[in-house]
Amino acid sequence: MIQSILDNDLYKFTMQQAVHMLYPRVDVEYEFINRSNTPFPKDFAQRLQVEVQGMKNFRLTPEEKEYLDKTCYFMTPVYLDFLEHYTFDPDEVTVSQTNSELSVTIKGPWYRTILWEVPLMAIISELYFVMTNARPLPDEQIRVINLNKAKILSCNNIRYADFGTRRRFSSSGHEALIRDILALEHNTLIGTSNVNLARLFNIKPIGTMAHEWIMFHGVLNGYRMANPTAVAAWATAFHGHLGIALTDTFTTDIFLSTFDTLHAKLFDGVRHDSGDPIAFIDRIVDHYKKLHIDPITKTIVFSDGLDIDKAVHIHNHCINRIRDSYGIGTNLTNDVGVTPLNMVIKLAKCRTAPEKDWHNAIKLSDDKGKHTGDSEELAHCIKVLERGM
């Protein structure tokens, strides 16, 4: 189900480098969230535990290290040496099942546990469809679907990346998707978040930061200072590379209130992951103009539950206003005639050092349906941020 230590999304490795550099003593706990309350089949946890144990066998090969060194110019020699000796520790993952309810937690040093989320979700997804005897569409029909999507995106000149590792139907289907898209002569695929597939198909690995980076800074520095300290720390770690900032962890309103000229010029653009995308375009364009920055020199990366029609609709509102690209996930890797799992694994708690107290980590987003974390802490965060506005 997992093919390599690099069968993971790039932003997990980039964040791991930053954590290893800046926050090596931080401990974290992640929790699996089954948003749709999907019932899991009998003995699912037992089968999942077998897959988790198998993860300890993956190591970075010399060829993979050479690939990262040549391709990912932002990865430091220190980090690559660390990753070369990294192994997954199954003891960091706790899996249990009560009737049809699945529970998964990941706990340990942040710089180690950060790599679990994506492959673990990919395993849960693929294993679920195996154990429920899901019947996907015939391969040739899936290929036609893949090609039709690629043609529409190409005809509309939409630059997009595959972001579908976490909720893919299968590893083999994921690989077939990339192969199908690349078979189209004038495709507009700019890369994939999956580092292993980027290596295999010689396309660009794509990704910067996830919500957990900013969520942690909310614990470290308080909710009002979470965004500015998170982007400043990112700049310290990468010196201007990987310059796409995520806006919605504590709402875009709060993000823009501290996204000043320095960081607006330093960062290449922002990522939209919740809320109304059209209203978001207007706000971001206006914000850059207020800072005397030409919006057409900046980029918005859209990644909020996209399908092809949504991408076309959004793109039409960006033309001649701001650059745009799209991270399309489940709609690419799990549009095979089954219902994809609606699940996430999110940072739930962290402590700044082993001797420090644990604190709840939360995310607001621009969509209340995507709020995650302890309900009391969410209410406290909202009060704190409202007082500061």
From Swiss-Prot:
EC annotation from Swiss-Prot or TrEMBL: 6.3.4.21
Protein family (similarity comment): Belongs to the NAPRTase family.
Function text: Catalyzes the synthesis of beta-nicotinate D-ribonucleotide from nicotinate and 5-phospho-D-ribose 1-phosphate at the expense of ATP.
Originating organism: Desulforapulum autotrophicum (strain ATCC 43914 / DSM 3382 / VKM B-1955 / HRM2)
Listed NCBIfam families: NAPRTase, PRK05321.1
Protein name: Nicotinate phosphoribosyltransferase
EC class of the enzyme, as a word: ligase
Modification after translation, per record: Transiently phosphorylated on a His residue during the reaction cycle. Phosphorylation strongly increases the affinity for substrates and increases the rate of nicotinate D-ribonucleotide production. Dephosphorylation regenerates the low-affinity form of the enzyme, leading to product release.
GO cellular-component term (any): cytosol
Catalysed transformations (reactions): nicotinate + 5-phospho-alpha-D-ribose 1-diphosphate + ATP + H2O = nicotinate beta-D-ribonucleotide + ADP + phosphate + diphosphate
Gene Ontology MF terms: nicotinate phosphoribosyltransferase activity
Pathway the protein acts in: Cofactor biosynthesis; NAD(+) biosynthesis; nicotinate D-ribonucleotide from nicotinate: step 1/1
Positions of post-translational Phosphohistidine modification: 211
UniProtKB keywords: Ligase, Phosphoprotein, Pyridine nucleotide biosynthesis
GO biological process entries: NAD biosynthetic process via the salvage pathway
